[in-house]
Amino acid sequence: MQFRFLLLAEGWRDSVLGAPRRLLVTLGSLSRDSSPCPAAKEEALPSLPVPDLETTLQKYLAQVEAVAPNHLERTRSLVRAFLSGPGPKLQQRLLERRQKTTNWATEWWLNDMYLSCPLALPINSNPGLAAKPKRFANQQEAAVFLARFLTELLNYQELLDRHGLEVERMKSKDGKTMQSLCMAQHYQMFRIYRRPGVNSDEQIILDRASSGDHIIVAHHNQFYNVPVRASDRGRITENELTQQLLRIMETKADPRTPPVGILTTAKRPAWAKAREELVKSERNRHNLELLERCLCVICIDDDVLPTTFNNPIRKEDRWIGDRDYANVLHHALHGGGSRHLGANRWFDKTVHAILGKTEDF
Protein backbone atom coordinates (compact mmCIF):
# COMPACT_ATOMS: atom_id res chain seq x y z
CA MET A 1 0.00 0.00 0.00
CA GLN A 2 2.83 2.39 0.78
CA PHE A 3 4.38 1.88 -2.66
CA ARG A 4 1.08 2.53 -4.37
CA PHE A 5 0.46 5.63 -2.26
CA LEU A 6 3.84 7.09 -3.16
CA LEU A 7 3.23 6.41 -6.82
CA LEU A 8 -0.20 7.99 -6.88
CA ALA A 9 0.76 10.93 -4.72
CA GLU A 10 3.97 11.86 -6.48
CA GLY A 11 3.35 10.56 -9.98
CA TRP A 12 6.34 9.98 -12.22
CA ARG A 13 9.03 12.56 -12.61
CA ASP A 14 8.84 14.50 -15.84
CA SER A 15 11.53 13.82 -18.40
CA VAL A 16 14.53 16.14 -18.24
CA LEU A 17 14.06 16.57 -21.97
CA GLY A 18 11.80 18.87 -23.89
CA ALA A 19 9.18 17.13 -26.01
CA PRO A 20 7.04 18.40 -28.88
CA ARG A 21 3.80 19.83 -27.52
CA ARG A 22 1.63 17.25 -29.25
CA LEU A 23 3.21 14.51 -27.11
CA LEU A 24 2.09 16.24 -23.94
CA VAL A 25 -1.62 16.07 -24.65
CA THR A 26 -3.97 13.15 -25.14
CA LEU A 27 -3.42 11.62 -28.54
CA GLY A 28 -5.98 9.81 -30.68
CA SER A 29 -7.76 6.69 -29.51
CA LEU A 30 -5.98 3.35 -29.50
CA SER A 31 -6.90 1.02 -32.33
CA ARG A 32 -7.84 -2.58 -31.65
CA ASP A 33 -7.87 -3.53 -35.31
CA SER A 34 -6.21 -6.92 -35.67
CA SER A 35 -6.65 -7.24 -39.43
CA PRO A 36 -3.55 -7.75 -41.54
CA CYS A 37 -1.78 -4.61 -42.68
CA PRO A 38 -2.10 -3.56 -46.35
CA ALA A 39 1.40 -4.82 -47.12
CA ALA A 40 0.39 -8.29 -45.99
CA LYS A 41 -2.31 -8.28 -48.68
CA GLU A 42 -0.08 -7.28 -51.59
CA GLU A 43 0.33 -10.90 -52.63
CA ALA A 44 -2.36 -13.54 -52.53
CA LEU A 45 -1.73 -15.81 -49.58
CA PRO A 46 -3.53 -19.12 -49.09
CA SER A 47 -5.80 -19.40 -46.09
CA LEU A 48 -4.66 -21.72 -43.32
CA PRO A 49 -6.00 -25.17 -44.27
CA VAL A 50 -8.20 -27.23 -41.97
CA PRO A 51 -6.91 -30.83 -41.73
CA ASP A 52 -9.57 -33.51 -42.16
CA LEU A 53 -11.01 -34.76 -38.89
CA GLU A 54 -9.64 -38.31 -39.10
CA THR A 55 -6.08 -37.06 -39.66
CA THR A 56 -6.34 -34.69 -36.69
CA LEU A 57 -7.57 -37.46 -34.38
CA GLN A 58 -4.90 -39.92 -35.51
CA LYS A 59 -2.19 -37.36 -34.76
CA TYR A 60 -3.77 -36.73 -31.37
CA LEU A 61 -3.71 -40.46 -30.53
CA ALA A 62 -0.07 -40.71 -31.63
CA GLN A 63 0.84 -37.93 -29.19
CA VAL A 64 -1.13 -39.56 -26.36
CA GLU A 65 0.68 -42.84 -27.01
CA ALA A 66 4.02 -41.06 -26.71
CA VAL A 67 3.35 -39.09 -23.52
CA ALA A 68 0.61 -41.04 -21.69
CA PRO A 69 0.53 -44.66 -22.95
CA ASN A 70 -1.43 -45.84 -19.89
CA HIS A 71 -4.35 -43.68 -21.02
CA LEU A 72 -4.25 -44.71 -24.67
CA GLU A 73 -7.15 -47.19 -24.68
CA ARG A 74 -9.41 -44.85 -22.76
CA THR A 75 -8.50 -42.03 -25.14
CA ARG A 76 -9.22 -44.21 -28.18
CA SER A 77 -12.70 -44.85 -26.81
CA LEU A 78 -13.26 -41.11 -26.36
CA VAL A 79 -11.99 -40.40 -29.86
CA ARG A 80 -14.42 -42.94 -31.37
CA ALA A 81 -17.29 -41.33 -29.47
CA PHE A 82 -16.20 -37.89 -30.65
CA LEU A 83 -15.93 -39.04 -34.25
CA SER A 84 -19.45 -40.49 -34.22
CA GLY A 85 -20.85 -37.63 -32.14
CA PRO A 86 -20.09 -33.87 -32.23
CA GLY A 87 -16.84 -34.17 -34.19
CA PRO A 88 -18.20 -33.81 -37.76
CA LYS A 89 -20.42 -30.84 -36.78
CA LEU A 90 -17.48 -29.03 -35.14
CA GLN A 91 -15.31 -29.82 -38.17
CA GLN A 92 -17.92 -28.20 -40.41
CA ARG A 93 -17.90 -25.08 -38.21
CA LEU A 94 -14.12 -24.91 -38.64
CA LEU A 95 -14.49 -25.12 -42.41
CA GLU A 96 -17.05 -22.30 -42.33
CA ARG A 97 -14.77 -20.20 -40.14
CA ARG A 98 -11.94 -20.70 -42.64
CA GLN A 99 -14.07 -19.13 -45.35
CA LYS A 100 -14.58 -15.98 -43.26
CA THR A 101 -11.08 -15.39 -41.90
CA THR A 102 -7.54 -15.08 -43.22
CA ASN A 103 -6.28 -17.47 -40.56
CA TRP A 104 -8.89 -19.39 -38.59
CA ALA A 105 -6.44 -20.32 -35.79
CA THR A 106 -4.76 -16.96 -35.09
CA GLU A 107 -7.33 -15.50 -32.68
CA TRP A 108 -7.64 -18.70 -30.67
CA TRP A 109 -3.90 -19.29 -30.58
CA LEU A 110 -3.15 -15.73 -29.53
CA ASN A 111 -5.75 -15.72 -26.76
CA ASP A 112 -5.16 -19.24 -25.46
CA MET A 113 -1.36 -19.33 -25.58
CA TYR A 114 -0.63 -15.71 -24.71
CA LEU A 115 -3.29 -13.18 -23.77
CA SER A 116 -5.25 -15.47 -21.43
CA CYS A 117 -2.15 -16.80 -19.71
CA PRO A 118 -1.94 -15.25 -16.20
CA LEU A 119 1.77 -15.95 -15.74
CA ALA A 120 4.35 -13.17 -15.59
CA LEU A 121 5.84 -12.17 -18.95
CA PRO A 122 9.56 -12.56 -18.13
CA ILE A 123 10.76 -16.10 -18.92
CA ASN A 124 7.21 -17.46 -19.44
CA SER A 125 6.46 -15.43 -22.56
CA ASN A 126 9.00 -12.77 -23.53
CA PRO A 127 12.11 -13.94 -25.43
CA GLY A 128 15.54 -12.32 -25.35
CA LEU A 129 18.87 -12.49 -27.14
CA ALA A 130 22.40 -11.20 -26.76
CA ALA A 131 24.32 -9.25 -29.40
CA LYS A 132 28.06 -9.38 -29.91
CA PRO A 133 29.96 -7.64 -27.09
CA LYS A 134 30.60 -3.96 -27.73
CA ARG A 135 33.00 -2.19 -25.40
CA PHE A 136 32.84 1.55 -24.77
CA ALA A 137 35.59 3.73 -23.35
CA ASN A 138 33.12 6.18 -21.81
CA GLN A 139 29.51 7.33 -21.72
CA GLN A 140 29.99 9.47 -24.82
CA GLU A 141 30.88 6.41 -26.91
CA ALA A 142 27.92 4.49 -25.50
CA ALA A 143 25.54 7.37 -26.27
CA VAL A 144 26.88 7.66 -29.84
CA PHE A 145 26.38 3.92 -30.32
CA LEU A 146 22.80 4.05 -29.01
CA ALA A 147 22.00 7.06 -31.19
CA ARG A 148 23.31 5.24 -34.27
CA PHE A 149 21.28 2.16 -33.31
CA LEU A 150 18.15 4.29 -32.97
CA THR A 151 18.83 5.99 -36.30
CA GLU A 152 18.95 2.64 -38.07
CA LEU A 153 15.86 1.51 -36.18
CA LEU A 154 14.02 4.62 -37.38
CA ASN A 155 15.21 3.94 -40.93
CA TYR A 156 13.71 0.47 -40.67
CA GLN A 157 10.47 1.82 -39.25
CA GLU A 158 10.16 4.26 -42.16
CA LEU A 159 10.78 1.38 -44.57
CA LEU A 160 7.85 -0.41 -42.96
CA ASP A 161 5.69 2.72 -43.06
CA ARG A 162 6.04 2.95 -46.82
CA HIS A 163 5.49 -0.82 -47.17
CA GLY A 164 8.94 -1.27 -48.69
CA LEU A 165 9.88 -4.56 -47.04
CA GLU A 166 10.47 -7.34 -49.52
CA VAL A 167 8.08 -10.25 -49.07
CA GLU A 168 9.83 -13.30 -47.64
CA ARG A 169 9.37 -16.69 -49.29
CA MET A 170 10.03 -20.32 -48.52
CA LYS A 171 9.88 -23.53 -50.50
CA SER A 172 6.45 -25.06 -50.86
CA LYS A 173 5.75 -28.69 -49.95
CA ASP A 174 6.45 -29.79 -53.51
CA GLY A 175 9.99 -28.44 -53.18
CA LYS A 176 9.74 -26.70 -56.54
CA THR A 177 7.77 -23.50 -56.03
CA MET A 178 8.27 -20.67 -53.55
CA GLN A 179 5.45 -19.69 -51.21
CA SER A 180 5.08 -16.07 -50.09
CA LEU A 181 4.86 -15.54 -46.33
CA CYS A 182 2.59 -13.20 -44.40
CA MET A 183 4.56 -10.09 -43.38
CA ALA A 184 2.02 -8.67 -40.91
CA GLN A 185 4.20 -9.44 -37.90
CA HIS A 186 7.04 -7.29 -39.27
CA TYR A 187 4.72 -4.34 -39.83
CA GLN A 188 3.26 -4.59 -36.34
CA MET A 189 6.43 -5.04 -34.30
CA PHE A 190 6.85 -1.36 -33.37
CA ARG A 191 3.13 -0.62 -33.10
CA ILE A 192 1.91 -3.35 -30.80
CA TYR A 193 1.46 -3.30 -27.05
CA ARG A 194 0.26 -5.83 -24.48
CA ARG A 195 -2.03 -4.23 -21.91
CA PRO A 196 -2.69 -6.30 -18.76
CA GLY A 197 -6.19 -7.50 -17.91
CA VAL A 198 -7.65 -9.24 -14.88
CA ASN A 199 -9.11 -12.09 -16.95
CA SER A 200 -7.17 -11.67 -20.18
CA ASP A 201 -4.64 -9.24 -21.59
CA GLU A 202 -5.48 -6.97 -24.50
CA GLN A 203 -3.35 -6.64 -27.61
CA ILE A 204 -3.25 -3.01 -28.72
CA ILE A 205 -2.29 -2.30 -32.33
CA LEU A 206 -1.51 1.36 -32.91
CA ASP A 207 -2.00 3.23 -36.16
CA ARG A 208 0.85 5.13 -37.79
CA ALA A 209 -0.66 8.52 -37.04
CA SER A 210 -0.62 8.08 -33.27
CA SER A 211 2.67 6.31 -32.50
CA GLY A 212 6.36 6.21 -33.30
CA ASP A 213 7.31 9.84 -32.62
CA HIS A 214 9.09 9.08 -29.36
CA ILE A 215 10.99 6.40 -27.53
CA ILE A 216 11.14 5.67 -23.82
CA VAL A 217 14.52 5.42 -22.09
CA ALA A 218 14.72 3.60 -18.75
CA HIS A 219 17.55 4.57 -16.39
CA HIS A 220 17.75 4.05 -12.62
CA ASN A 221 14.18 2.66 -12.72
CA GLN A 222 12.94 6.01 -14.10
CA PHE A 223 11.36 6.41 -17.54
CA TYR A 224 12.17 9.32 -19.84
CA ASN A 225 10.19 10.40 -22.87
CA VAL A 226 12.61 11.14 -25.72
CA PRO A 227 11.18 12.59 -28.95
CA VAL A 228 12.68 11.26 -32.16
CA ARG A 229 10.58 13.46 -34.43
CA ALA A 230 9.80 17.13 -33.97
CA SER A 231 6.43 18.55 -34.98
CA ASP A 232 8.00 21.30 -37.12
CA ARG A 233 10.92 19.55 -38.87
CA GLY A 234 10.58 15.78 -38.78
CA ARG A 235 13.28 13.49 -37.42
CA ILE A 236 15.81 14.92 -35.00
CA THR A 237 19.46 14.43 -35.87
CA GLU A 238 21.72 11.66 -34.64
CA ASN A 239 23.79 14.21 -32.74
CA GLU A 240 20.67 15.54 -31.00
CA LEU A 241 19.77 11.99 -30.02
CA THR A 242 23.27 11.51 -28.61
CA GLN A 243 22.97 14.63 -26.47
CA GLN A 244 19.59 13.60 -25.09
CA LEU A 245 20.86 10.12 -24.23
CA LEU A 246 23.93 11.61 -22.53
CA ARG A 247 21.78 13.82 -20.34
CA ILE A 248 19.84 10.78 -19.18
CA MET A 249 23.00 8.75 -18.57
CA GLU A 250 24.34 11.53 -16.35
CA THR A 251 21.31 11.51 -14.03
CA LYS A 252 21.83 10.04 -10.58
CA ALA A 253 19.73 7.38 -8.91
CA ASP A 254 17.02 8.72 -6.62
CA PRO A 255 15.95 6.32 -3.83
CA ARG A 256 12.60 8.13 -3.69
CA THR A 257 11.79 7.06 -7.25
CA PRO A 258 9.13 4.33 -7.16
CA PRO A 259 10.35 1.33 -9.24
CA VAL A 260 7.15 1.26 -11.26
CA GLY A 261 8.63 -0.95 -14.01
CA ILE A 262 8.65 -3.92 -11.64
CA LEU A 263 4.86 -4.04 -11.93
CA THR A 264 5.23 -5.40 -15.48
CA THR A 265 7.03 -8.45 -14.04
CA ALA A 266 4.06 -9.47 -11.89
CA LYS A 267 1.42 -12.03 -12.76
CA ARG A 268 -0.92 -10.42 -15.24
CA PRO A 269 -4.06 -10.16 -13.04
CA ALA A 270 -2.03 -8.54 -10.24
CA TRP A 271 -0.50 -6.03 -12.65
CA ALA A 272 -3.92 -5.32 -14.16
CA LYS A 273 -5.36 -4.46 -10.74
CA ALA A 274 -2.38 -2.23 -9.94
CA ARG A 275 -2.83 -0.50 -13.29
CA GLU A 276 -6.48 0.21 -12.46
CA GLU A 277 -5.25 2.15 -9.43
CA LEU A 278 -2.57 3.97 -11.42
CA VAL A 279 -4.92 5.30 -14.09
CA LYS A 280 -7.02 7.03 -11.42
CA SER A 281 -4.26 9.65 -11.54
CA GLU A 282 -4.40 11.77 -14.70
CA ARG A 283 -0.61 12.13 -14.67
CA ASN A 284 -0.02 8.40 -14.40
CA ARG A 285 -2.63 7.75 -17.09
CA HIS A 286 -0.81 10.12 -19.43
CA ASN A 287 2.55 8.47 -18.72
CA LEU A 288 1.12 5.01 -19.33
CA GLU A 289 -0.20 6.26 -22.66
CA LEU A 290 3.28 7.47 -23.61
CA LEU A 291 4.66 4.03 -22.79
CA GLU A 292 1.98 2.34 -24.87
CA ARG A 293 2.61 4.59 -27.88
CA CYS A 294 6.40 4.65 -27.89
CA LEU A 295 8.43 3.15 -30.71
CA CYS A 296 10.53 1.05 -28.33
CA VAL A 297 12.07 1.03 -24.86
CA ILE A 298 15.82 1.57 -24.38
CA CYS A 299 17.08 0.29 -21.02
CA ILE A 300 20.36 1.76 -19.79
CA ASP A 301 21.69 -0.31 -16.88
CA ASP A 302 24.41 1.02 -14.60
CA ASP A 303 25.08 -2.41 -13.14
CA VAL A 304 25.46 -6.05 -14.14
CA LEU A 305 24.21 -9.25 -12.56
CA PRO A 306 26.75 -10.51 -10.02
CA THR A 307 28.86 -13.51 -10.94
CA THR A 308 27.16 -15.39 -8.11
CA PHE A 309 23.79 -15.10 -9.86
CA ASN A 310 24.42 -18.36 -11.74
CA ASN A 311 26.78 -19.89 -9.22
CA PRO A 312 25.09 -23.34 -9.28
CA ILE A 313 25.86 -23.64 -12.99
CA ARG A 314 29.31 -24.91 -13.88
CA LYS A 315 31.52 -22.28 -15.47
CA GLU A 316 32.13 -24.42 -18.55
CA ASP A 317 28.35 -24.53 -19.10
CA ARG A 318 27.86 -20.76 -19.05
CA TRP A 319 31.09 -19.18 -20.35
CA ILE A 320 32.11 -18.85 -23.99
CA GLY A 321 35.56 -17.36 -24.18
CA ASP A 322 35.67 -14.50 -21.69
CA ARG A 323 31.90 -13.92 -21.59
CA ASP A 324 29.38 -15.37 -19.13
CA TYR A 325 26.55 -15.95 -21.60
CA ALA A 326 24.23 -17.44 -18.98
CA ASN A 327 24.38 -14.19 -17.03
CA VAL A 328 24.05 -12.12 -20.20
CA LEU A 329 20.87 -13.96 -21.18
CA HIS A 330 19.45 -13.67 -17.67
CA HIS A 331 20.19 -9.96 -17.99
CA ALA A 332 18.22 -9.84 -21.24
CA LEU A 333 15.31 -12.05 -20.15
CA HIS A 334 14.45 -10.63 -16.75
CA GLY A 335 17.24 -8.39 -15.45
CA GLY A 336 17.68 -10.42 -12.28
CA GLY A 337 14.36 -9.45 -10.74
CA SER A 338 13.59 -6.77 -8.18
CA ARG A 339 16.93 -7.15 -6.38
CA HIS A 340 18.88 -6.25 -9.48
CA LEU A 341 17.71 -4.67 -12.77
CA GLY A 342 14.19 -6.01 -13.26
CA ALA A 343 12.54 -2.66 -12.46
CA ASN A 344 14.50 -0.92 -15.22
CA ARG A 345 12.26 -2.54 -17.85
CA TRP A 346 8.76 -2.27 -19.27
CA PHE A 347 7.93 -5.81 -20.30
CA ASP A 348 4.57 -4.97 -21.89
CA LYS A 349 6.31 -3.26 -24.82
CA THR A 350 7.36 -5.50 -27.69
CA VAL A 351 10.81 -4.12 -28.54
CA HIS A 352 13.42 -3.55 -25.83
CA ALA A 353 17.10 -2.77 -26.30
CA ILE A 354 19.26 -3.14 -23.20
CA LEU A 355 22.66 -1.53 -22.74
CA GLY A 356 24.65 -3.05 -19.88
CA LYS A 357 27.27 -1.44 -17.71
CA THR A 358 30.13 -3.08 -19.60
CA GLU A 359 29.86 -4.38 -23.15
CA ASP A 360 26.49 -6.10 -23.12
CA PHE A 361 23.83 -5.00 -25.60
Please report, for each region that a protein language model flagged, where it lies by residue.
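Long, Pro/Ser/Thr-rich low-complexity/intrinsically disordered regulatory tracts in eukaryotic proteins
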Residues: 2-348, 355-358
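Classical protein tyrosine phosphatase
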Residues: 361
